[in-house]
Amino acid sequence: MKSHIQSLLIQALDALKQQGVIPTDFEARVQVDRTKDKTHGDFATNLAMMLTKVARKNPRELAQLIIDSLPQDSQVAKVEIAGPGFINFFIDENALASQLMAALNDDHLGIQLPEPQTVVVDYSSPNLAKEMHVGHLRSTIIGDSVVRALEFQGHNVIRQNHVGDWGTQFGMLLAYMEELRAENGEQAQMELSDLETFYRAAKVRFDESEDFAIRARKLVVSLQSGDEYCNKLWREFNDISLSHCHDVYERLGVSLTRKDVRGESTYNDDLEQVVKDLDAKGLLSESNGAKVVFQDEFKTKDGDPLPVIIQKADGGYLYATSDLAAMRYRSNVLKADRALYFVDLRQGLHFQQVFKLARTAEFINPDMSLEHMGFGTMNGDDGRPFKTRSGGVVKLVDLLTEADTRALELVRSKNPDMDQAELEKIAKVVGISSVKYADLSKNRASDYIFSFEQMLSFEGNTAPYLLYAYTRVAGIFKRATDIDLSDAKMQLDHDKEKDLGNKLAQFGEVLSRMVTKGQPHALCGYLFELAGAFSSFYEACPVLAAESEEQKKSRLLLSQLTAKTLKQGLDLLGIETLERM
C-alpha cells in the first residue's frame, strides 16, 4: 500500500509539472511514512513542504494542489491536510481487507516482488585453523537471515563462505600433524577432533622449538609451491575443519553447504595478476620493499597517506589482495549486482579502502554495489567480548550445548508431565532459537550483552515469547477443524481488527528494509509488534465465540494470516516454529 500511495503522488506531481506549478525537469524524492496516530490517517507525506521552495508557494496551498491532482482511487477513503502542510491518507477498510485476503492466498504473503538481482552474500567465513567460536555467530546468522529474505523476494542469491584456509599458520599445523603421524601413525588424525587443543599444541611447539619452526616455514613454502604431499595433508586438515563448521551450521539451522565454500586459497592463482594489473594502471607504489596503493581520501591520524598493502616485501600477499581477486570474480564471473559482506564493523576501514580500489582499478562493473554489512560484538556482563570464566575463547558448540541444557530445564518446568523425548525436541528448538533471536533482534551495528536469562524469558522481545505466540494462534485452529473458510470474507469492524490488519499489511515494507539495509532486527521488531497486536485483538474480539458465524469466519481468517505471517517471518530468521510448547 505504501508503494501504491507513492505511485499516486508521482502521478500528481506529473500533473503539476504539466500545469507549470513545478519545473518539468525537477525530480522529487517522494517519501511516504506510516502514521503512528491513526487519527491522522494511515500514511502521511511531507512532499508539499519539500516542494515549497521550487514551487514558490505556501506548503498548505501546495498540499491542496497535490490533493486536487491525485487520481481517483478506490483504495483511498479520504485525503486531508494537517499542520503546516502534511498530507494524510486514510485507507479504505474494504481495500485493506481485500489486500489481506490476497496476502492469505499468496505464497509470498502479497508482498510486491522487486526486479530480481544477482546478489553475492559473503558470510560466516571462519578461519579453518580453529573451531568456530562465539565471534563467528553474528556473521553466520545475520548473513543467513538476509540470504533467506533475499531469496523470498525472488533474488538469485549466491552464498560465499570465504573461509580462511590459507596462510602461514598452516605450515605450523601441517608440521605438527606430520610430527604426530610419525609418532602415532594414522591415529594422529583423531587429535583433530578438538581443533582448539590441536592448534594450541602446535603453537607451543612452534614457539618452543626452533627446529619445528624451521620445518613449519619450509612446509609453507612447499604448500604454496604446490607440493603434492603438503597439499594432501592440507586438504585433509581443511576437510576435518570444515566438518566441524558444518556440524555447527546444522545445529544452528543455517543454510550454508559445502558447495558454498570458496576460501582464500581459491584465489591463489589470481593474486599475481592482481598485482600486475594494479601496476599496469599506475596505481602501485613501493614502501619499505612492499607494493602498496595510496588513495588520497585515506590518511593516518597524523595526516600521512594510509596505504593498502598489496604484496609484502617477502613476496607474500595479504587479505586486501585476495579480497580484490574475489571482488573481480564476483563481478566478472558471478555477474553480481550486489555483493554484501557480513564482517565485523572493526574491518570497516579495510573494506572502504578495497571497495574504492576495486572501482579505481576497474576490477568490477561500475554498477555493482559493494556493501559492508558490519556488526558489533557479543559481550559478557563486563561489557567486553564474551569469554569463558578463565578468559578463554568460548567455542560456539559449547554455547549451543549450554543453551539446549538451559532450555530443557525451562521447558520441563513449564511441562512437568511431558515425556522426555518431546521435552528434548521442544528444548532443542527453544535453545537454538533463543540464541539466534537474541542476536538478530539487536541492531547489527550495536554491541550487546549476552544473557541466557534474558533470551530464555517468556516476556519481552524474545524467541520463547514469539514461539509461544505462534502456538497460541495455531492452537485456535485445533479447535476449529470443522469450520469451512472457503467462502469466508474478511471484515474489519472492530478497532482491534483494524489495528491487526494494518500491522499485517506492513510485512512487505519491513522485509524490504531488511534486505536493503541488512537489518534482521527490523523483522524481529515487527514480529514482536504483530504478536502484541494479535494478543490485543484476541482479548477484545472473541474468535470461536464470536456473535455470528460470519464474524467468526472473518476473525479466523485474520488469525490464519497472523499465524502464516509469524511462521514465515520466523522462518526468514532461520527459526523453526512449534505447534506445542
From Swiss-Prot:
A motif ('HIGH' region) lies at residues 126-136. SMART domains: Arg_tRNA_synt_N, DALR_1. GO terms for molecular function: arginine-tRNA ligase activity; ATP binding. It catalyses: tRNA(Arg) + L-arginine + ATP = L-arginyl-tRNA(Arg) + AMP + diphosphate. Pfam families: Arg_tRNA_synt_N, DALR_1, tRNA-synt_1d. One of its GO terms (biological process) is arginyl-tRNA aminoacylation. Its EC number is 6.1.1.19. It is found in: Cytoplasm. This is Arginine--tRNA ligase. It comes from Shewanella sediminis (strain HAW-EB3). The lineage of its organism: Bacteria, Pseudomonadati, Pseudomonadota, Gammaproteobacteria, Alteromonadales.
